Amino acid sequence: VRYKEPTMRNTKGFTLIELLIVVAIIGVLAAVGIPMYNGYIADSKRTAAMENFERVVKFIDTEILKCRAMGGTPMRLRDKSGGVTTVPCPVDSKDDKTNQAFLDHFEGLGMKNPYYPATPATTRPSGKACAEGCISIDGHNTVFAVNMTYLDSKGEKQKMPQWLRYLHQISG
């Protein structure tokens, strides 16, 4: 009887070594890719939050300047339901109704918090806590203060520098 050497002709599939190499490659790709993906997501949320902040600041600044230039013509702002509300000129930063009208305007436009997309990007001036990505507007004496908290690249909360508009400089 002759001994016949086994052949690999009819074997189908992968060897254990080949499978282990593929699993190791997938593990390395996941170890590198997942943190990078999370970093990209965090960067995009931070960028969107800062764009919202700048949009709010520019809008309020423009509306106050238009108020002065147009000789007291009331501002027409959008309300939460998409309708129009008017705010008298000159603007009173201490008036919660004025602050609320600005907040409602951005909620009516559908501005969302990038960290919590189900919620508006603005919070109420009643002093409620503001989560990251949330923009608050508050008025004191002759100053509008617009604030925002965001997460930095390390995931730590940071405050966007306050933007202040001194009303006495614009209204006369």
What are these model-predicted stretches?
Residues 1-8:
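Short, Lys/Arg-enriched N-terminal segments with co-localized hydrophobic residues
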Residues 5, 18, 51-54, 63, ...:
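Glutamate identity and glutamate-enriched acidic tracts
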Residues 5, 13-17, 26, 56, ...:
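Generic N-terminal initiation segments characterized by hydrophobic and/or small/turn-forming residues
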Residues 9-38:
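N-terminal single-pass transmembrane signal-anchor helix
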Residues 15, 19-24, 56, 68-81:
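Catalytic cores of transferase enzymes with a strong primary signal for eukaryotic protein kinases
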Residues 42-71:
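Membrane-proximal N-terminal amphipathic helix
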Residues 65-172:
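Periplasmic/extracellular, small/polar-rich flexible segments of pilin-like filament-forming proteins
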